[in-house]
Regions:
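Short, conserved beta-strand segments within well-ordered enzyme catalytic domains
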Residues: 63, 78-80, 89-93, 119-123, ...
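Glycine-rich active-site/cofactor-binding loop and its immediate structural neighborhood
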Residues: 86-130
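Generic secondary-structure signature for well-ordered alpha-helical cores
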Residues: 47, 57-64, 138, 164-168, ...
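Conserved active-site-proximal phosphate/metal-binding subdomains
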Residues: 1-39, 179-186, 253-278, 285-345
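An N-cap/entry alpha-helix motif that binds or orients negatively charged groups
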Residues: 2-86, 182, 191-208, 345
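Alpha/beta enzyme core
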Residues: 97, 110-111, 135-139, 150-281, ...
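Conserved active-site and cofactor/substrate-binding residues in soluble primary-metabolism enzymes
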Residues: 21, 46, 50-54, 108, ...
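A gly/proline- and charged-residue-enriched helix-loop-helix capping module
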Residues: 114-136, 140-155
């Protein structure tokens, strides 16, 4: 992310939020409002940050093959995902410690998702809790993501509460058996509020297995998402175990160092899924062209984390709505310049 941070630091005029026209303006506002600890938490990654850089490199090294002289007057950037018609195939990815970026914490992205027309996946280590976030946008569908920090009763309690509060899917993060060293944070002895509140006893996550997933599937009627899939082999296992959504993710480069970039993994996972499970992808997705590349390679939706955090830090839910509007403009333009009017083409 170092290259991106340097590119964000350009001279920009001071304008009102509703007049923002570029991602750089959100970055400038966010960096002004966040302290250095929170900025580094948002844009930092594990150890050498190689996986994080590879996320961006995978996107940047994938080039388009545009077609011309086609009627692209009516471009449709919407999509269906988890039974929902979305204005963009975007899931605001789970971020712990959103309360470090904005006073509304997890409620802000949910409100923005409801106003814009996409989905928010709430992290279990994000205030103010799943009930309060559900109440912030009671008529809009949302997803809950869990870090397994307790036994079967702990898991069941969260699934039941999610169901009782109208969440339409339940995600398990499966790439956090061990907590990585995020050296930007460690060097400053910085601990996020989410980590302080939740505690990080990893024993239960280390033992969490396919048997535990099956137990939840057998007991509850809710679509299951596994977040943190990075190989065809695990994607095959997802299909064999009836997983509804395979979430290709390397935790934004914040867990295993020297992993592959997300987009580099996508094609093999889509092939392994073989249409029997939906596939979503996160990892470095910041621009409309990034989203279009993921959809062209078979994703059903993308997760956006740092994009979301940066916009929220810049100005709360209204800023995130504006950022999503600009993203939609970029997606529509990219599709049109490619000579297509939908992702299916």
């Amino acid at each position: 992310m170092a290259e991106q941070r340097e590119n964000f630091e350009i001279d920009l005029p001071n304008v009102e939020l509703q007049d923002y026209e570029t991602l750089h303006e959100f970055a400038k506002a966010a960096k002004t409002k966040l302290d250095q600890n929170s900025w580094d938490y948002l844009f930092g990654a594990a150890y050498t940050e190689t996986t994080c850089r590879r996320n961006r490199q995978a996107l940047d090294s994938t080039a388009f093959r545009p077609r011309v002289l086609r009627n692209v007057e009516h471009v449709d950037a919407s999509a269906q995902f988890l039974g929902q018609k979305l204005r963009l195939p975007v899931v605001l990815a789970p971020i712990g410690s959103m309360q470090d970026f904005d006073v509304e914490a997890g409620a802000g992205p949910t409100k923005a998702a409801a106003e814009f027309g996409c989905l928010h996946m709430l992290s279990s280590v994000c205030a103010p809790g799943l009930e309060a976030v559900a109440a912030a946008a009671p008529n809009h569908p949302k997803i809950f993501q869990l870090y397994v920090r307790g036994d079967a009763n702990f898991v069941d309690d969260h699934v039941k509460r999610a169901l009782d509060n109208g969440y339409i899917a339940f995600a398990f993060t499966v790439d956090l058996d061990y907590y990585s060293k995020r050296e930007r944070d460690l060097a400053k002895r910085y601990v996020t509020t989410g980590r302080r509140l939740a505690g990080y006893n990893e024993d239960h996550q280390m033992r969490f297995s396919w048997d535990d997933v099956k137990r939840v599937q057998d007991k509850f009627d809710i679509p299951i998402i596994l977040k943190g899939i990075a190989t065809a082999e695990d994607a095959h296992a997802c299909v064999e175990n009836g997983i509804d959504v395979i979430y290709v993710s390397n935790h934004g480069g914040r867990q295993l160092d020297h992993g592959r970039g997300g987009l580099d993994v996508l094609s093999e996972v889509v092939t392994a899924a073989d249409g029997k499970a939906k596939v979503m992808l996160d990892g470095g997705i910041m621009r409309g062209a990034d989203l279009v590349k993921a959809m062209a390679l078979g994703a059903d939706a993308v997760g956006m984390g740092r994009f979301q955090g940066m916009a929220i830090a810049a100005g709360g839910a209204p800023a995130l709505v504006r950022a999503l509007e600009l993203l939609e403009d970029e997606v529509r333009a990219a599709l049109g310049m490619l000579g297509v009017t939908s992702y299916a083409e």
